[in-house]
C-alpha cells in the first residue's frame, strides 16, 4: 500500500478486504485505455507479489486455526509482560525493609521504572520488526525478558534491581509494540476488532491480575518469588511461541519469496512488490524516525496517544498507592489488599466484553449504511468509555476519603477498568485501521506516550494525596479526564478531514 494515512482505494466496487489481500497489485495504478475508458493494470514481470488474492502464503489468507493459534500466543505474551509490571508492587514494603530504602519516590520508581523500558523499547523494536520481520523480534525479546526477570529475582541491592527492571521492561515491550501489527498482518479490517480485543486483554488485565497474585506470593514466600514465577511462566511461553508464532509481515515474506525465486531462476532483476529500494540502514533509520514523526505530525496520533497515556498513568498511580490506601483507611492485611485490585479486573473484563461484541458489528453496520468503511466507525463506543473514567475517579476518591464501606471504592475502580478497556480498544483499532501499513510504528508511538505517563505519574501520587487528600487529589485527576471526553466526539466529526488534510499527511 502507498504511504499515507488511509488504505488507498481503487474504485468504489472493490471491498476493503480484497484491497488488503491483493496487496500492491492494486497499487501499481490504473492505466486509462482508449477502449471505452476501461482501466487495466500493467504489471512488471520482474515484480514478485502474492499469487493472486487467495494465495495461502499471504497471512490474510491463513486458516482460522493458524491465525487463532498465533493470536493466542501473542496475547499470552502480551498478558505476561504487563503482569510483570505490577506483580511486584505489593512486595515493595518487604523490599524497602530488606534494602533499607527510606525514599518513597524510590520505592515507587522501582515499580514504575519497568514502564520506562516500555518507553524506549518500542523505538527500537518497531523498526527492527519492519526491517527483519516480526517472528525473530518476538523470539529474541522473549528470551531477553526471561534473562532479565531472573536477574531481578537475584538482585543484590536496590540499584541493580532498578536497572534489571528497566531492561526487563525494554524486552517486555515487544508484544505491546508489534502485537497490533501482527493482527493487522493476519486480519482484514472487518475481522480485526475481535482479534484486537483478545490482544488488548493483556496490557489491561495483566497489570490488574499481577498485584492479586503478587500480594499472596509476597506474604507467603517473599517479594523475590514474584520474579521466580514470572521467569518460569515466561520461559514456558517462550518455548511454546517458537512453534506457534510464524512470520506474518508481508514485506518480509515477499522479500524471502524474491530471494528464493532469484536463486531458483537466476534472474537477479526480480524484486519484491513491497521493496522500497532503500538499503537496510536507510530502512532502519526511516523506521526509527517514523513513530516520532507520526506522533508529532498527526494530531490524531498525538492527542489519542496523550489521552491513553493519561488513563494508563492513572492506572499505575492506583497500582502504587492502592495498597497504602486500603491498609491505612480500612486496615487490610498485605494478602487481602491484593484483592482490592479485582475491581479494576472485573471492570476491564466488562469493557472487553462490551467492545469485543460491538466493534466489528458497528463497523459493518455503519459501512453498510454509508457505503464505505472508515476508521472513524471505531470511535462511537469511546464516548461512554471516556465518561466512565472521571466517574470512577470521583467515586473512588471521595468514598475512600470518607471511609465508606470498602466495596464502594472498589466498585469505583471498576468503572476505570471498563472505561480504560473501551478507550484503549477504540484508540488501538482506530489507529491500526487508519495507519494499517505502519501499524507497528503507530502503536510504538502510542506505547511510548502511554508508558511514559505510567512511569512518571505514579511518582507524583504520594505527594499529591498528602497535599490534596484522597478526595480532591482524585477529583483533580477526574477533572482532567473529563476534559478529554470531547476527543472521541471531535474525531468522529472531524477525524476524516484531519486524516486527509495535506497539512497533516505523514509521508516517509
UniProtKB/Swiss-Prot annotation:
Keyword GTP-binding: no
Keywords, comma-separated and alphabetical: Glycoprotein, Membrane, Peroxisome, Transmembrane, Transmembrane helix, Transport
UniProt-listed PROSITE patterns: MFS
Annotated TM spans: 73-93, 108-128, 143-163, 166-186, 197-217, 225-245, 299-319, 335-355, 379-399, 407-427, 435-457, 475-495
Biased composition (Basic and acidic residues): 35-46
CDD domains: MFS_Tpo1_MDR_like
Gene Ontology terms: cellular component: peroxisomal membrane
Domain remark in the UniProt entry: The peroxisomal targeting signal allows recruitment to the peroxisomal membrane by pex19.
Family: Belongs to the major facilitator superfamily.
Name of the protein this chain belongs to: MFS-type transporter penM
Species of origin: Penicillium rubens (strain ATCC 28089 / DSM 1075 / NRRL 1951 / Wisconsin 54-1255)
Gene: penM
Amino acid at each position: 500500500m502507498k504511504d499515507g494515512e488511509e488504505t488507498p482505494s481503487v474504485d468504489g466496487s472493490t471491498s476493503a478486504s480484497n484491497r488488503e489481500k491483493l496487496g500492491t497489485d492494486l497499487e501499481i495504478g490504473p492505466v486509462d485505455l482508449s477502449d471505452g475508458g476501461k482501466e487495466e493494470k500493467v504489471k512488471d514481470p520482474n515484480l514478485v507479489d502474492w499469487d493472486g488474492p487467495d494465495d495461502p502464503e499471504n497471512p490474510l489468507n491463513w486458516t482460522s486455526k493458524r491465525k487463532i493459534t498465533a493470536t493466542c500466543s501473542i496475547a499470552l505474551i502480551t498478558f505476561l509482560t504487563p503482569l510483570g509490571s505490577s506483580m511486584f508492587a505489593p512486595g515493595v514494603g518487604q523490599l524497602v525493609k530488606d534494602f533499607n530504602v527510606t525514599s518513597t519516590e524510590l520505592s515507587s520508581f522501582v515499580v514504575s521504572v519497568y514502564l520506562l523500558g516500555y518507553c524506549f523499547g518500542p523505538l527500537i523494536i518497531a523498526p527492527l520488526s519492519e526491517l527483519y520481520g516480526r517472528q525473530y523480534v518476538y523470539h529474541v525479546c522473549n528470551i531477553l525478558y526471561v534473562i532479565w526477570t531472573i536477574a531481578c529475582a537475584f538482585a543484590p541491592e536496590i540499584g541493580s534491581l532498578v536497572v534489571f527492571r528497566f531492561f526487563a521492561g525494554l524486552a517486555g515491550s515487544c508484544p505491546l509494540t508489534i502485537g497490533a501489527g501482527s493482527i493487522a498482518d493476519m486480519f482484514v479490517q472487518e475481522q480485526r476488532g475481535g482479534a484486537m480485543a483478545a490482544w488488548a486483554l493483556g496490557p489491561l488485565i495483566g497489570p490488574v491480575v499481577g498485584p492479586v497474585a503478587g500480594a499472596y506470593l509476597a506474604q507467603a514466600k517473599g517479594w523475590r518469588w514474584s520474579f521466580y514465577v514470572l521467569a518460569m511462566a515466561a520461559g514456558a511461553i517462550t518455548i511454546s511461541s517458537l512453534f506457534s508464532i510464524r512470520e506474518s509481515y508481508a514485506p518480509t515474506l515477499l522479500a524471502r519469496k524474491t530471494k528464493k525465486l532469484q536463486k531458483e531462476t537466476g534472474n537477479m532483476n526480480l524484486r519484491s512488490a513491497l521493496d522500497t529500494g532503500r538499503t537496510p540502514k536507510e530502512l532502519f533509520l526511516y523506521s526509527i524516525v517514523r513513530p516520532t514523526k507520526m506522533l508529532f505530525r498527526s494530531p490524531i496520533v498525538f492527542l489519542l496517544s496523550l489521552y491513553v497515556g493519561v488513563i494508563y498513568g492513572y492506572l499505575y498511580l492506583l497500582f502504587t498507592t492502592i495498597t497504602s490506601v486500603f491498609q491505612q483507611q480500612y486496615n487490610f492485611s498485605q494478602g487481602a489488599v491484593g484483592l482490592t485490585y479485582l475491581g479494576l479486573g472485573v471492570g476491564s473484563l466488562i469493557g472487553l466484553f462490551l467492545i469485543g461484541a460491538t466493534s466489528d458489528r458497528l463497523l459493518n453496520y455503519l459501512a453498510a449504511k454509508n457505503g464505505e468503511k472508515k476508521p472513524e466507525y471505531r470511535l462511537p463506543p469511546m464516548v461512554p468509555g471516556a465518561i466512565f473514567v472521571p466517574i470512577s475517579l470521583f467515586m473512588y476518591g471521595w468514598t475512600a476519603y470518607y471511609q465508606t464501606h470498602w466495596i464502594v471504592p472498589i466498585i469505583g475502580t471498576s468503572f476505570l477498568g471498563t472505561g480504560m478497556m473501551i478507550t484503549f480498544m477504540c484508540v488501538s483499532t482506530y489507529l491500526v485501521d487508519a495507519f494499517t501499513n505502519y501499524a507497528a510504528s503507530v502503536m510504538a508511538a502510542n506505547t511510548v506516550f502511554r508508558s511514559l505517563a505510567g512511569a512518571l505519574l505514579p511518582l507524583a501520587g504520594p505527594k499529591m494525596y498528602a497535599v490534596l487528600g484522597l478526595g480532591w487529589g482524585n477529583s483533580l485527576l477526574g477533572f482532567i479526564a473529563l476534559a478529554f471526553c470531547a476527543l472521541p466526539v471531535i474525531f468522529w466529526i472531524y477525524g476524516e478531514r484531519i486524516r486527509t488534510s495535506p497539512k497533516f499527511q505523514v509521508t516517509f
